[in-house]
Every structure is written in C-alpha cells, then in structure tokens.
Amino acid sequence: MPNNYRIAKVSSLLKKEITLILQNDLENDLLRSNFISISKIEVTGDLQFCKIYISSAAEGNIRKEIIENLNLAKNYIKHILGQRIEMRRVPELTFKDDTALAKGLSVLKLLEELNNKTHNQNSQVEENNDNV
C-alpha cells in the first residue's frame, strides 16, 4: 500500500526541483520567452512515473510546442534530478498541458459576452420604454 505522506513529500520535492531546472538549466528560447509554471504533479504509488502538468498563457500551437520541447528534454531533466535529489530511482517524467487555465479564461470570456449581451438588451428595452 502506498504511503501517501511519502508520495506527497516526493511530489513536493519534484515540483520544487523541476521548477528550478526549468528556470535555470534549460536553454530553450521557447521556454524562456513564454511564462510557464507547474500547476500539478501526479506521482504513482510506486514512485515510478510522474506526470507534470504545465500551465501557460501562450496560445494553442505554442502551448503544444512547449509541451513537446519539455518531453524532448525529459531525459536531461531526469538526469539533473538524479544529481540533485536522493532517490533510488528518479521517476519517468511525462509533461502534459494543463488546460484548466485556458478553460477558465474561455468561461470568463463567455460570461463577459453574456453580461454585455444582457446589458445591451436592457439598454434597448429602456430606450424603447423612454420612446413610448
């Protein structure tokens, strides 16, 4: 049975170290020119696999390219992690696009459009009432 405390501790450590690696050790213009952050890390109970969810304000194609670049660099990142943290085995890394931010922004945009539409309809009704 997996030790949830250990998984949480390893997840926290991985998030901290991977963030530092992304900021300081990767020399990738695409990553440096776009703000990216780790929104969530999921580590399996046996600590063999780790999914890293990346959020970014970049547009769709650029987001995909960022994730592709990170997945291409995952062995290098894993190597650096192995040097920095004491674990028998560093988990296999997989970078995923966290679309929660983009979905949230699209919901806010829809709500704003709905609010504007309602406001415009109310203005027209008031204008019609004034003309009567």
From Swiss-Prot:
It is found in: Cytoplasm. Disulfide bonds: none annotated. PROSITE patterns: RBFA (PS01319). One of its GO terms (cellular component) is cytosol. Keywords: Cytoplasm, Ribosome biogenesis. InterPro entries: KH_dom-like_a/b, RbfA, RbfA_dom_sf, Ribosome-bd_factorA_CS. The keyword Cytoplasm applies. Transmembrane segments: none annotated. It comes from the Bacteria. One of its GO terms (biological process) is maturation of SSU-rRNA. One of its GO terms (molecular function) is ribosomal small subunit binding. Gene3D superfamilies: 3.30.300.20. Monomer. Binds 30S ribosomal subunits, but not 50S ribosomal subunits or 70S ribosomes. Belongs to the RbfA family. One of several proteins that assist in the late maturation steps of the functional core of the 30S ribosomal subunit. Associates with free 30S ribosomal subunits (but not with 30S subunits that are part of 70S ribosomes or polysomes). Required for efficient processing of 16S rRNA. May interact with the 5'-terminal helix region of 16S rRNA. PANTHER family: RIBOSOME-BINDING FACTOR A, CHLOROPLASTIC-RELATED (PTHR33515:SF1). This is Ribosome-binding factor A. It comes from Prochlorococcus marinus (strain MIT 9515).
